[in-house]
Amino acid sequence: MLQSWRQALWALLLLVSVAQAQFNFFDQMFGGGEQQRQQQRSQNSPSDSDRYQQMWNGAQCDHYLCPGTLACVHFPHHCPCPHPDVEEKVELGEGSAVCVSKGGFKAGEAARKIELARKGLL
């Protein structure tokens, strides 16, 4: 008799744990994890520019201070791209340059497409 009670209790515990796991899955699946997402959102940096302004004001540069990277360079078109792993710098002439997404293309492909677009061929 004790053996059957033990088996029944074991089966009940197993059933409860499976049900709990199932409800946790559905809770996460259908928005029950909203509280966790809100906590993650609240940890993001605010969108004001005070921190950037402080870094800009504290930067030491005798030449040109790049606005996107705060790098100190001799000329504006020498500014590096903020995300060199995924961006390619393309010099447009007249001392200007732009950073464009590489988009998975081989090196120089973005520059070629920009040049074609400037000529009206793309």
Curated annotation (Swiss-Prot):
Span of the signal peptide: 1-21
Gene Ontology BP terms: ERAD pathway
Ranges in coiled-coil conformation: none
Domain of life, source organism: Eukaryota
Family annotation (InterPro entries): LCL2 (IPR034543)
Keyword Iron part of the UniProt annotation: no
Keywords in alphabetical order: Signal
Assigned protein family: Belongs to the LCL2 family.
Function summary: Probable component of the endoplasmic reticulum-associated degradation (ERAD) pathway.
Protein name from the UniProt record: Long chronological lifespan protein 2
Organism: Penicillium rubens (strain ATCC 28089 / DSM 1075 / NRRL 1951 / Wisconsin 54-1255) (Penicillium chrysogenum)
Lineage of source species: Eukaryota, Fungi, Dikarya, Ascomycota, Pezizomycotina
Gene designation: lcl2
